[in-house]
Amino acid sequence: MAETWVSEIMTQALGCLQAFSSEFALEWESSDMKAAIFKLLLGWIVLSLTAILLAWKSYGPTVNSIYYRQGMGGQNGGTPEYPARFPVWESSSTESLKRHQE
C-alpha cells in the first residue's frame, strides 16, 4: 500500500517536472532576451561559487584555525571539555571566594 502511494507521488512529481520543462523550453525559444538574462545570471552564479570554492581552499585552514582552536581551551578557546573542578555550588572545599573590590 505504501509503495503505491510513493509511486503516485513520484508520477505526479515527474509529470509536473515535465510540464515545467516543456513550458520553459517554449519560453526559451520564444524570447531571446529571457534566454540571455538567464545565461548571464547562471554564469554569474557559477563564477561566484567557483570564486568562493577557490578562496575557501586557499584561506579555509586559516579561518578554521581562528575559530576552532585545538588544545586545552576547547572549542573557540572557551571552557575545556572536562572541568578541572566542580562549580562553586557543588564544591565541598572551604576555600574563600574571590570578591569584587571597589
UniProtKB/Swiss-Prot annotation:
Coiled coil: none annotated. It comes from the Eukaryota. GO terms for cellular component: membrane. It is found in: Membrane. Its main location: membrane. The keyword Membrane applies. InterPro entries: TCTA. Keywords: Membrane, Transmembrane, Transmembrane helix. One of its GO terms (biological process) is osteoclast fusion. The keyword Transmembrane helix applies. Belongs to the TCTA family. This is T-cell leukemia translocation-altered gene protein homolog. It comes from Xenopus laevis (African clawed frog). The gene is tcta.
